Amino acid sequence: MNPPTEAERIARGMARALAASPDDRAQAREHLARALGRDARWLTTVQRAVRQRFGAYGGEALAARHEELAGFLARRPAFLEAFENIHERPYLAGYFTFHPRMGAAPLALGGAAMPALATAGDLAAWLKLGVEELDWFAGVRVRDGRRLAEPLNHYRYQWVPKANGGMRLLEIPKRRLKQMQRRILDEILYFVPPHEAAHGFRPRHSALTHAAGHAGRAAVLRMDLRNFFVSVPARRVHALFAALGFPASVARLLTGLTCHITPKAVLREQLAARAADRGYRGYDAAAWRNWSAWFAPHLPQGAPSSPVLANLCAFNLDVRLAALAEDAGVHYTRYADDLAFSGERALARGVEGFKRIVATIAAGEGFAVNARKTHLMLRSQRQQLTGVVVNARPNVRRDDYERLKAILHNCARHGPAGQNREGLPDFRAHLAGRVAHLARLNPARGARLARSLAAIAWPD
């Protein structure tokens, strides 16, 4: 018999006994004795540790954290030492039935109607799946993300060029998994409020609201987080779902449905192609190490649930940066991976030290600042955040306006087909969205562009 495996099995039985017990030391001790077939001296130490860690001897408080309790018991020195004593060696003699329950939801949810998903069966039924099918989609059996031919791979991959050079990997879920992620987003995640400094991926907030609070400031500091989505590990996503009241087993499945391990072949092929373009065979080890985070479970950029999950998992980052900003007398907002700070001349004078503190806080929360994208913009320069000019008031960049104006003019003169150079499936809606965004920043210019948009003859 392997003691660690046996210890885990017995610890689960003890956890069930405590979950079924009233919150009373004597009755909890009686339940443990029934589970083990006899009382034991080392149970006193275990009970004391449980009370100190979970704030209860038994009952609802422990039932809601049943799996965490089992893991805690399995690691207690007094429990493990008992395996070495032939007279006190634990074994299970009695079994208590246990029905997992949802934990208490955070008060911040304001009584929102979260789905009650206490078991894997509940989650499977909610997603209209069988339990084995749920395991398949959640990647429960996956331990190696290396093979593209892996039958549990529910993603397709697309490389797109970044605006400033390099390539970005989009990990796009296939249809059925995407539908599940969308339901998790719509019926669970949208109820959870992010930090007030976060302006991306939430209702009534936008790139404009992110930028507007920084208008008319003497100094604006723009910073960027490198690889924002992949920097959010699965353990942080699991902790979020657990904090929402989902039992550990359900939180684990929800995490599996929303996180992904990139097959190494995807990255190997891209690095080999890049090396070939540069005229040498193979690829260097440093480039491979730069992609190491993709080989662990992370939020995939391309999944509908990832932006909101990343926002929520960055909550503590926002708390710390907002506190830093308040202490320094500056304003802070975040739009996805874009950080913005603004204030008076004092911010410019102390900017080097301020940047170091921001980078240290980000590193402590698992993120890295991209130093090449850090810019201090004074009032005498063009101050721009997420495409919005904020020198005096939120406004559109003149070159953005002129570029869109030229596209609309060419569409009206030569037809829209030749202007859709990116092959967008709904070019008309794309242009309408750009015009509407510009109109929010500059109504007069927006009205002129709206007239140009209306003059385009669209094919039936």
Placement of each model-derived feature along the sequence:
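Active-site-proximal segment of RNA-dependent polymerases
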Residues: 177-230, 259
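Short amphipathic alpha-helical segments at helix boundaries and their inter-helical linkers
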Residues: 56-59, 142-159, 258-272
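Nucleic-acid processing machinery
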Residues: 106, 110-111, 117, 148-161
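Glycine/proline-rich, flexible active-site/cofactor-binding loop segments
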Residues: 158-200, 272-297, 304
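Conserved polymerase palm-domain catalytic core
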Residues: 215-335, 340-361, 365-368, 374-377, ...
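A conserved non-catalytic segment of reverse transcriptases
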Residues: 361-414
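Short, hydrophobic/amphipathic alpha-helical packing segments
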Residues: 117, 181, 314-318
